Protein backbone atom coordinates (compact mmCIF):
# COMPACT_ATOMS: atom_id res chain seq x y z
CA UNK A 1 0.00 0.00 0.00
CA UNK A 2 2.95 2.30 0.76
CA UNK A 3 4.46 1.41 -2.57
CA UNK A 4 1.41 2.51 -4.45
CA UNK A 5 0.79 5.59 -2.28
CA UNK A 6 3.77 7.74 -3.28
CA UNK A 7 3.46 7.19 -7.07
CA UNK A 8 -0.25 7.95 -6.84
CA UNK A 9 0.38 11.25 -5.05
CA UNK A 10 3.06 12.14 -7.60
CA UNK A 11 0.66 11.40 -10.45
CA UNK A 12 -2.00 13.62 -8.91
CA UNK A 13 0.54 16.44 -8.55
CA UNK A 14 1.58 16.11 -12.16
CA UNK A 15 -2.04 16.08 -13.28
CA UNK A 16 -2.78 19.20 -11.30
CA UNK A 17 0.27 20.97 -12.70
CA UNK A 18 -0.60 20.03 -16.27
CA UNK A 19 -4.13 21.20 -15.77
CA UNK A 20 -2.81 24.47 -14.45
CA UNK A 21 -0.47 24.96 -17.37
CA UNK A 22 -2.92 24.06 -20.09
CA UNK A 23 -5.96 25.55 -18.47
CA UNK A 24 -4.55 29.06 -17.90
CA UNK A 25 -1.57 31.12 -19.05
CA UNK A 26 1.45 31.14 -16.87
CA UNK A 27 1.81 34.32 -14.84
CA UNK A 28 4.31 35.18 -12.18
CA UNK A 29 1.66 37.14 -10.30
CA UNK A 30 0.02 33.84 -9.55
CA UNK A 31 2.81 33.08 -7.12
CA UNK A 32 1.95 36.23 -5.18
CA UNK A 33 -1.09 36.88 -3.14
CA UNK A 34 -4.05 39.00 -4.32
CA UNK A 35 -2.64 42.58 -4.48
CA UNK A 36 -6.00 44.30 -4.51
CA UNK A 37 -7.96 43.23 -1.57
CA UNK A 38 -11.55 44.30 -1.54
CA UNK A 39 -12.50 46.58 1.37
CA UNK A 40 -14.48 44.99 4.03
CA UNK A 41 -18.11 46.00 3.95
CA UNK A 42 -19.16 48.33 6.75
CA UNK A 43 -21.60 46.94 9.20
CA UNK A 44 -25.08 48.42 8.85
CA UNK A 45 -25.85 51.24 11.24
CA UNK A 46 -28.59 50.67 13.76
CA UNK A 47 -31.80 52.56 13.03
CA UNK A 48 -31.82 56.03 14.52
CA UNK A 49 -34.47 56.71 17.10
CA UNK A 50 -36.87 59.43 15.85
CA UNK A 51 -36.68 62.75 17.67
CA UNK A 52 -40.21 63.75 16.71
CA UNK A 53 -43.56 62.10 16.90
CA UNK A 54 -43.40 58.65 15.32
CA UNK A 55 -46.75 59.14 13.63
CA UNK A 56 -45.54 62.16 11.56
CA UNK A 57 -43.90 61.81 8.17
CA UNK A 58 -40.32 63.02 7.97
CA UNK A 59 -38.13 62.70 4.90
CA UNK A 60 -35.00 62.58 7.04
CA UNK A 61 -35.97 59.08 8.19
CA UNK A 62 -34.99 57.75 4.75
CA UNK A 63 -31.41 59.04 5.02
CA UNK A 64 -28.62 57.79 7.25
CA UNK A 65 -26.85 61.12 7.50
CA UNK A 66 -28.45 63.60 9.89
CA UNK A 67 -29.96 66.71 8.42
CA UNK A 68 -27.81 69.78 9.01
CA UNK A 69 -29.70 72.89 10.05
CA UNK A 70 -28.44 76.00 8.33
CA UNK A 71 -28.30 79.23 10.32
CA UNK A 72 -27.78 81.40 7.26
CA UNK A 73 -30.36 84.16 6.96
CA UNK A 74 -32.68 83.87 3.96
CA UNK A 75 -31.94 86.04 0.99
CA UNK A 76 -34.14 89.09 0.90
CA UNK A 77 -35.93 89.89 -2.37
CA UNK A 78 -34.67 92.95 -4.21
CA UNK A 79 -36.44 96.15 -3.24
CA UNK A 80 -38.91 97.28 -5.85
CA UNK A 81 -38.80 100.95 -6.83
CA UNK A 82 -41.68 103.07 -5.59
CA UNK A 83 -43.67 104.02 -8.69
CA UNK A 84 -46.11 106.25 -6.84
CA UNK A 85 -45.83 109.97 -7.27
CA UNK A 86 -44.29 111.71 -4.29
CA UNK A 87 -45.42 115.17 -3.29
CA UNK A 88 -42.11 116.17 -1.80
CA UNK A 89 -40.15 118.58 -3.90
CA UNK A 90 -36.52 119.31 -3.49
CA UNK A 91 -35.48 122.82 -2.74
CA UNK A 92 -33.87 124.35 -5.81
CA UNK A 93 -30.27 125.15 -5.45
CA UNK A 94 -29.61 128.86 -5.52
CA UNK A 95 -26.35 130.66 -5.65
CA UNK A 96 -25.70 132.77 -2.62
CA UNK A 97 -25.24 136.45 -3.29
CA UNK A 98 -21.95 137.63 -1.87
CA UNK A 99 -22.37 140.28 0.83
CA UNK A 100 -21.95 143.77 -0.45
CA UNK A 101 -19.19 145.74 1.11
CA UNK A 102 -20.52 148.93 2.63
CA UNK A 103 -19.02 152.18 1.47
CA UNK A 104 -18.82 154.94 4.11
CA UNK A 105 -19.96 157.47 1.50
CA UNK A 106 -23.19 155.55 0.67
CA UNK A 107 -26.60 156.58 2.05
CA UNK A 108 -27.59 154.74 5.22
CA UNK A 109 -30.75 155.23 7.29
CA UNK A 110 -28.82 154.64 10.49
CA UNK A 111 -27.10 157.97 9.93
CA UNK A 112 -30.33 159.73 11.00
CA UNK A 113 -30.03 158.40 14.56
CA UNK A 114 -28.72 160.77 17.20
CA UNK A 115 -26.02 158.38 18.35
CA UNK A 116 -24.47 158.21 14.86
CA UNK A 117 -24.52 161.93 14.12
CA UNK A 118 -21.52 164.08 14.55
CA UNK A 119 -21.42 167.42 16.29
CA UNK A 120 -21.83 169.39 13.09
CA UNK A 121 -24.78 167.31 11.66
CA UNK A 122 -28.52 168.03 11.96
CA UNK A 123 -30.43 165.91 14.51
CA UNK A 124 -33.96 165.66 15.93
CA UNK A 125 -33.04 167.97 18.80
CA UNK A 126 -32.35 170.77 16.33
CA UNK A 127 -35.87 170.43 14.90
CA UNK A 128 -37.37 170.51 18.40
CA UNK A 129 -35.48 173.71 19.16
CA UNK A 130 -36.81 175.35 16.00
CA UNK A 131 -40.44 174.46 16.83
CA UNK A 132 -40.12 175.55 20.46
CA UNK A 133 -38.80 178.95 19.39
CA UNK A 134 -42.06 179.63 17.50
CA UNK A 135 -40.60 179.44 14.00
CA UNK A 136 -43.24 179.27 11.26
CA UNK A 137 -42.23 179.33 7.59
CA UNK A 138 -45.70 180.56 6.51
CA UNK A 139 -45.40 184.36 6.76
CA UNK A 140 -49.03 185.06 5.73
CA UNK A 141 -50.43 183.80 9.02
CA UNK A 142 -48.21 185.83 11.30
CA UNK A 143 -44.91 187.57 11.75
CA UNK A 144 -41.93 186.44 13.72
CA UNK A 145 -41.78 185.18 17.26
CA UNK A 146 -45.13 185.43 19.07
CA UNK A 147 -46.97 186.16 15.83
CA UNK A 148 -45.77 182.87 14.54
CA UNK A 149 -47.19 181.20 17.61
CA UNK A 150 -50.55 182.84 16.98
CA UNK A 151 -50.47 181.66 13.41
CA UNK A 152 -49.80 178.14 14.61
CA UNK A 153 -52.81 178.31 16.92
CA UNK A 154 -54.94 179.52 14.03
CA UNK A 155 -53.77 176.63 11.94
CA UNK A 156 -54.78 174.21 14.65
CA UNK A 157 -58.19 175.86 14.82
CA UNK A 158 -58.58 175.47 11.08
CA UNK A 159 -57.78 171.81 11.38
CA UNK A 160 -60.38 171.46 14.15
CA UNK A 161 -62.94 173.17 11.95
CA UNK A 162 -62.25 170.82 9.08
CA UNK A 163 -62.66 167.88 11.42
CA UNK A 164 -65.98 169.31 12.65
CA UNK A 165 -67.21 169.74 9.08
CA UNK A 166 -66.35 166.16 8.29
CA UNK A 167 -68.24 165.03 11.40
CA UNK A 168 -71.32 167.07 10.44
CA UNK A 169 -71.28 165.54 6.96
CA UNK A 170 -71.20 162.08 8.50
CA UNK A 171 -74.12 162.93 10.79
CA UNK A 172 -76.11 164.31 7.83
CA UNK A 173 -75.57 161.12 5.87
CA UNK A 174 -76.68 159.02 8.84
CA UNK A 175 -79.86 161.08 9.30
CA UNK A 176 -80.65 160.81 5.59
CA UNK A 177 -80.28 157.04 5.71
CA UNK A 178 -82.58 156.74 8.72
CA UNK A 179 -85.17 159.01 7.10
CA UNK A 180 -85.16 157.01 3.86
CA UNK A 181 -85.58 153.78 5.83
CA UNK A 182 -88.57 155.19 7.72
CA UNK A 183 -90.13 156.45 4.48
CA UNK A 184 -89.79 153.03 2.85
CA UNK A 185 -91.34 151.37 5.90
CA UNK A 186 -94.24 153.82 5.86
CA UNK A 187 -94.87 153.29 2.15
CA UNK A 188 -94.85 149.53 2.65
CA UNK A 189 -97.33 149.77 5.52
CA UNK A 190 -99.71 151.96 3.49
CA UNK A 191 -99.59 149.66 0.47
CA UNK A 192 -100.24 146.58 2.61
CA UNK A 193 -103.19 148.33 4.32
CA UNK A 194 -104.70 149.29 0.95
CA UNK A 195 -104.39 145.74 -0.38
CA UNK A 196 -105.98 144.40 2.82
CA UNK A 197 -108.95 146.77 2.46
CA UNK A 198 -109.41 145.77 -1.19
CA UNK A 199 -109.50 142.10 -0.28
CA UNK A 200 -111.90 142.76 2.55
CA UNK A 201 -114.22 144.74 0.24
CA UNK A 202 -114.17 141.96 -2.36
CA UNK A 203 -115.06 139.35 0.27
CA UNK A 204 -117.92 141.51 1.60
CA UNK A 205 -119.41 141.84 -1.92
CA UNK A 206 -119.13 138.08 -2.41
CA UNK A 207 -120.86 137.41 0.91
CA UNK A 208 -123.71 139.80 -0.03
CA UNK A 209 -124.24 138.05 -3.36
CA UNK A 210 -124.27 134.67 -1.67
CA UNK A 211 -126.83 135.88 0.90
CA UNK A 212 -129.12 137.25 -1.82
CA UNK A 213 -128.82 134.03 -3.79
CA UNK A 214 -129.72 131.94 -0.76
CA UNK A 215 -132.57 134.28 0.08
CA UNK A 216 -133.95 133.99 -3.48
CA UNK A 217 -133.93 130.21 -3.26
CA UNK A 218 -135.95 130.34 -0.02
CA UNK A 219 -138.51 132.70 -1.59
CA UNK A 220 -139.08 130.32 -4.51
CA UNK A 221 -139.58 127.44 -2.06
CA UNK A 222 -142.16 129.44 -0.10
CA UNK A 223 -144.06 130.43 -3.26
CA UNK A 224 -144.15 126.82 -4.48
CA UNK A 225 -145.43 125.56 -1.13
CA UNK A 226 -148.28 128.15 -0.63
CA UNK A 227 -150.81 126.59 -3.15
CA UNK A 228 -150.54 123.23 -1.47
CA UNK A 229 -151.40 124.82 1.89
CA UNK A 230 -154.41 126.60 0.41
CA UNK A 231 -155.59 123.40 -1.31
CA UNK A 232 -155.38 121.47 1.94
CA UNK A 233 -157.42 124.21 3.73
CA UNK A 234 -160.16 124.07 1.05
CA UNK A 235 -160.39 120.30 1.34
CA UNK A 236 -160.70 120.51 5.11
CA UNK A 237 -163.52 123.12 4.85
CA UNK A 238 -165.44 121.03 2.33
CA UNK A 239 -165.26 118.01 4.55
CA UNK A 240 -167.00 119.83 7.40
CA UNK A 241 -170.88 119.42 7.13
Swiss-Prot record:
It comes from the Eukaryota. Residues 24-173 are extracellular. Residues 143-154 have a biased composition (Gly residues). It is a single-pass type I membrane protein. The chain crosses the membrane at residues 174-196. Residues 30-168 are annotated as: Disordered. Belongs to the CD99 family. May function as a homophilic adhesion molecule. This is CD99 antigen-like protein 2. It comes from Xenopus tropicalis (Western clawed frog).
Amino acid sequence: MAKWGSPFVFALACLALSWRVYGDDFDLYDALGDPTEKPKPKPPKPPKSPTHDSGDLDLSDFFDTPVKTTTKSPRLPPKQPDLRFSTTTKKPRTTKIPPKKSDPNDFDLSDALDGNNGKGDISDSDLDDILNDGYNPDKKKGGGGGGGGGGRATGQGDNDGSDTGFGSQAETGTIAGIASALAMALIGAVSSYISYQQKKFCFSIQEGLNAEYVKGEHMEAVVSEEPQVKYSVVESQSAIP
